[in-house]
Amino acid sequence: MKYDLIIIGSGSVGAAAGYYATRAGLKVLMTDAHMPPHQQGSHHGDTRLIRHAYGEGEKYVPLVLRAQALWDELSTHNEEPIFVRSGVVNLGPADSAFLANVARSAQQWQLNVERLDATALMTRWPEIRVPDNYIGLFEADSGFLRSELAITTWLRLAREAGCAQLFNSPVSHIHHDDNGVTIETSEGCYHASKALISAGTWVKALVPELPVQPVRKVFAWFKADGRYSTKNRFPAFTGEMPNGDHYYGFPAENDELKIGKHNGGQLIQAPEERKPFAAVASDGAEAFPFLRNVLPGIGGCLHGAACTYDNSPDEDFIIDTLPGHENTLVITGLSGHGFKFAPVLGEIAADFALGKTPSFDLTPFRLSRFSQ
């Protein structure tokens, strides 16, 4: 059998692509080296932020606004919502370049973002402490996503729509010829007209020339009470420290508040190098500088987890066809800020398989930018 689209890697982007391509009427085969959702990639740990006024640059805003519409639609397929509109407050020095990008994105796209000075911040959320020179940019329409529930939902919907799924079966080789794409797996060879490579952190095992660096990252849950929950209207947050370190976190659930540090981490070259949480001496204390200064009422570390970023050299996404192979799309280099975009990236992959022109300007995400 020849498929219209084979998906190599069915985590966040791959799961979304499988659903949207199958829903569009294509014959699709989803593959993964493990059984998604799983612990080997970048999607576990229950929650991920979604921000609209984007500190990483306004080129992302059209993508994230489309993603939000798709998240809202996906949430209707579950009793438990996938998207929680908790609001997100972005904290940092008034001269922060990241916050300047947030403000610029909000102005350009007329987004609902409120600017709060330090006094107003601490009045609205007495649990938060910031220096006098800090501001907060509050996005009331943003919030967080339940990442593993999202992937489970996409996989179920794709399967119900007739998508073939081959999991716990790593792809060992990809071959291109005039008839399309062939993949080799432990279960045999499979053929398709087109392929999506969304293999996440270890994409270089299949495409060694891609400029992607795996980075071991950790996040942890700390003791918190009801003051820090959505029931008390406590928001999700990002925070920039005076030294430039960036943190992110979520409202407390079941008296546990999850927080992680976005920058830093350990460069790794193989899956076995991603040691579990607490295997690196600094893991448990990584969030202390932020908690001690900004959320001093939070208690001790309860547990944590390790994940992996697939960083590109400039930490912007890679969305492009493989050089010399126009029938193979690569989506990688999501650099620790990609999950919120998963549905729109999956939709882009489905449009690619359908032969449609993308609805977005993907020029900033081309591979050619690294050879200029």
Swiss-Prot record:
The modification S-8alpha-FAD cysteine is found at residue 307. FAD binds at residues 4-34. Belongs to the MSOX/MTOX family. MTOX subfamily. This is N-methyl-L-tryptophan oxidase. Keywords: FAD, Flavoprotein, Oxidoreductase. SUPFAM superfamilies: FAD-linked reductases, C-terminal domain, FAD/NAD(P)-binding domain. GO terms for cellular component: cytosol. The keyword Ion transport does not apply. It is an enzyme of class 1 (oxidoreductase). It catalyses: N(alpha)-methyl-L-tryptophan + O2 + H2O = L-tryptophan + formaldehyde + H2O2. Catalyzes the oxidative demethylation of N-methyl-L-tryptophan. Binds 1 FAD per subunit. Its cofactor is FAD. Its EC number is 1.5.3.-. Monomer. GO terms for molecular function: flavin adenine dinucleotide binding; N-methyl-L-amino-acid oxidase activity; sarcosine oxidase activity.
